[in-house]
Regions:
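Sec/Tat signal peptide C-region and signal peptidase I cleavage site
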Residues: 22-26
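N-terminal low-complexity, Pro/Thr/Ser-rich intrinsically disordered segments
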Residues: 27-54
Length: 262
């Protein structure tokens, strides 16, 4: 695992990802918000004219704290959460749509090994597989068929050329290794946590309330906002989950300029 990962390769990765601009098949993109709510603090981003995916066209990103709770907030020019991947019927090659908050937090903050990559909080939807085995998000009595329902993760990211030039992946766990993992790790061979914090969607906004043992670490952190598509490797092998299309970056360059508001 990378022991000294800086923001420089991360910024390069995002620029490369924009250049890749892989096509993504989806439905439900056009749901304009005619009276978007006002958003204060955090990062404000210009709406994209005639955005191809307004549900992922970031206009505001923020993290605030109250007590030991951090609220991850993102607003878009369309209706948040209305667009999900089109089911493919199989795991291999399937897609994940995401709202992501890359942070300066060390991965050890949430139970991974220290300095193991870039810690990001994410809200995702992927109809072809379920990675929250402890939770029944749809309330149908089955905990293994809810991948299409928007849900939250912590992920650790690193660049990997196997995903494409300058592309990011969720860090793989090599065979025979036993890295430190959160108690709610879903059993996949990647650095991912499924903590069960439920996202709340309202018109143009998605928010998630997340408790922390040490809120001071969060208050000292910086962040950015990203919307992106990821894809499961067609061979279902390392690298298992790659970022294949970045829809938008709040700062434009992934410099993590956002400051957490106490």
């Amino acid at each position: 695992m990378c022991k000294h990962l800086s923001l420089t390769p991360l910024a390069f990765t995002v620029a490369a990802a924009f250049a890749i601009n892989a096509p993504v098949w989806a439905h439900g993109d056009r749901h304009p918000v005619t009276h978007p709510a006002s958003h204060s603090g955090g990062l404000h981003t210009q709406a994209t004219k005639q955005a191809a995916k307004p549900a992922f066209d970031i206009v505001h990103t923020r993290i605030t704290t109250e007590g030991n709770i951090a609220t991850f907030h993102m607003a878009v020019s369309g209706r948040a959460g209305v667009t999900r991947p089109t089911p493919s019927g199989k795991l291999a090659g399937s897609q994940v749509f995401s709202y992501v908050w890359p942070t300066s937090l060390d991965p050890s903050t949430v139970g991974f090994d220290a300095k193991s990559g870039i810690l990001a909080f994410a809200v995702t939807s992927h109809p072809d597989f379920d990675d929250t085995p402890l939770f029944d998000e749809s309330g149908d009595g089955q905990a293994t068929n809810d991948g299409h329902v928007w849900h939250s993760h912590w992920v650790v990211l690193q660049p990997d050329e196997a995903c494409g030039k300058g592309a990011l992946k969720v860090v793989d766990i090599p065979d025979g290794t036993k890295p430190r993992l959160p108690k709610t790790w879903p059993g996949l061979p990647i650095l991912i946590d499924s903590p069960g914090w439920s996202p709340r969607f309202s018109r143009d906004t998605v928010e998630v309330r997340v408790p922390f043992d040490d809120i001071g670490v969060v208050q000292a952190a910086s962040f950015d906002g990203v919307t992106a598509a990821l894809r499961v490797n067609a061979s279902v092998h390392n690298p298992l989950l790659c970022v294949v299309n970045v829809f938008k970056v709040a700062s434009g360059d992934l410099s993590l300029p956002g400051k957490v508001q106490p």
